[in-house]
Amino acid sequence: HSVDSSKKAIELTDKNIELNKSFFPKQSEHASFAIDTFDFLETAANKYDVIILDPPAFAKHQNVKHNAVQGYKRLNAEAFKKIKAGGILFTFSCSQVVDTNLFNSTVMAAAIIAKRKVHVLHYLNQPQDHAPSIFHPEGAYLKGLVLYVE
């Protein structure tokens, strides 16, 4: 399944899947949903082998950092509830006010809420072609985790 709140993003996803259908032998099993991801995860009956969470920035300013952390925690907790044992979760943040340590702690809190055992397979950050300046540490805002969920 592909889920995005943007109908345009879903239309582009469907178009790309059609263009690349030779790489998707079970294309008929794919479904796209233009819906809020929180709503989808809370109501979805399926359990998934792989989930990729790549939301837009939840916070661009310090005054909304707490709300962003709560959003990341809720989103990841719902994903942990919907992933099969042995599944892989890719989770990302591009909120510059939520640093890597806070993001990792928030994802850990989500795993605790969902009562799932989780192992970090990879810590991810922005590639070298998007390197931040040493004089602007806030430029290091892209972060992610690849997690194995028991």
Language model features: what each stretch is:
Residues 48-78:
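Mobile active-site "lid"/loop adjacent to the S-adenosyl-L-methionine
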Residues 10, 14, 18, 38-45, ...:
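Generic hydrophobic alpha-helical scaffold/packing signal
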Residues 88-150:
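C-terminal catalytic and target-recognition region of SAM-dependent MTase-like enzymes
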Residues 1-4:
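Conserved SAM-binding motif I beta-strand of class I
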Residues 8-10, 39-41, 59-61, 97-100, ...:
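Flexible loop/turn segments at secondary-structure boundaries
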Residues 83-85:
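Helix-to-beta-strand junctions that scaffold the AdoMet/dcAdoMet cofactor pocket
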Residues 6-52:
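S-adenosyl-L-methionine
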Residues 6, 37, 68, 95-96:
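Short beta->alpha junction loops/turns
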